[in-house]
């Protein structure tokens, strides 16, 4: 009987220890956030969500995602006209970025119904939201259209005013990313297609008046994203099938490219089995999250119909800072909890 009692007591302690361990694990998971689904988001209208940018909506107390909404599921569109004639979609998250719901098309006073809106970036400064939008006049079957970057402002992310077109390096500029430096200066990195699709730089003291500073990165790429994290400035550039190139700087002027790209190797998750493209980064506390898009149908085993080849999904992965480099593991669960942001 004594032996039986000791054995029973051991089992009891074992169960208690397992329960405590499970509680600790659950608490840690709760603190780091819930696991984001794969894919994180698909647009319910055109199924063509791409080029995401996230911003904290102070009035609503929720996170908003603005994104290029390509017309992926519209049949009979010739050439690349399905990526033209597009508007910017808006999705909303009330749980710190875990789940997203479609809200509306952004009402932007730029061009007409046949024109094209791409790849917005949004920053908040002194109570005003500033959007820098890529505008392409018209709808085109090829990539021949002009591109420019247009500045808009809003008090609430809903009602926008067109401030005007920026005077930059050429008539084929796109994909702005804007960041304020430690000294208060604003910088914009963007893609100039007239210069071999390399990344150029413009500078402003107030977000209103911009001076072009020429080429910032010599390598080809598009969709740059600039941010500050772990005492460095970072610039992530979409290099298509080669993944996302990562550049690091101490002054946001001289950039060193790390050897390995992000998201070049296809993942294993749903809609994530291809390389990742055109990303946004949200720094939340001491963590950073990479939001990117994929073309899930562009893999060897996928159907070759137009809709499957064209559709796109938004995904998220947490960035890590390891030995001075940025890394991420898209195959691991992404626990996410975006805090209310004072900087956006």
At which residue positions do the language-model features occur?
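Carbohydrate-active catalytic/glycan-binding domains of CAZyme proteins
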Residues: 25-344
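Bacterial N-terminal signal peptides that target proteins for export
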Residues: 1-14
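Bacterial N-terminal signal peptides
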Residues: 12-23
């Amino acid at each position: 009987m004594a032996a039986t009692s000791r054995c029973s007591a051991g089992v009891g302690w074992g169960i208690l220890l397992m329960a405590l361990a499970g509680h600790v694990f659950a608490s840690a998971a709760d603190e780091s956030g819930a696991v984001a689904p794969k894919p994180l988001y698909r647009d319910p209208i055109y199924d063509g969500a791409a080029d995401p940018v996230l911003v904290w909506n102070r009035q609503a107390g929720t996170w908003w995602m603005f994104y290029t909404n390509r017309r992926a599921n519209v049949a009979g569109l010739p050439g690349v006209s399905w990526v033209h004639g597009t508007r910017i979609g808006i999705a909303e998250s009330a749980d710190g970025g875990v789940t997203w719901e479609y809200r509306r098309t952004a009402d932007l006073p730029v061009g007409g119904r046949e024109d094209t809106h791409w790849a917005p970036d949004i920053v908040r400064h002194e109570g005003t939201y500033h959007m820098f939008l890529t505008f392409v006049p018209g709808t085109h079957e090829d990539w021949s259209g002009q591109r420019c970057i247009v500045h808009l402002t809003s008090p609430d992310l809903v009602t926008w005013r067109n401030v005007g077109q920026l005077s930059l390096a050429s008539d084929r500029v796109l994909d702005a990313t804007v960041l304020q430096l430690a000294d208060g200066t604003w910088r914009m990195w963007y893609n100039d297609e007239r210069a071999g699709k390399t990344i150029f730089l413009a500078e402003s003291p107030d977000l209103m008046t911009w001076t072009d500073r020429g080429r910032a990165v010599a390598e080809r790429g598009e969709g740059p994203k600039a941010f500050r994290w772990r005492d460095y400035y970072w610039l992530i550039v979409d290099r298509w099938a080669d993944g996302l190139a990562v550049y690091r700087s101490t002054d946001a002027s001289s950039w060193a490219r790390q050897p390995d790209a992000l998201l070049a190797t296809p993942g294993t998750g749903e809609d994530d089995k291809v390389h990742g493209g055109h990303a946004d980064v949200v720094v939340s506390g001491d963590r950073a999250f990479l939001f990117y898009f994929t073309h899930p149908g562009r893999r060897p085993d996928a159907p070759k119909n137009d809709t499957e080849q064209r559709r796109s999904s938004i995904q998220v992965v947490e960035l890590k800072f390891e030995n001075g480099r940025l890394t991420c593991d898209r195959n691991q669960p992404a626990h996410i909890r975006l805090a209310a942001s004072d900087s956006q």
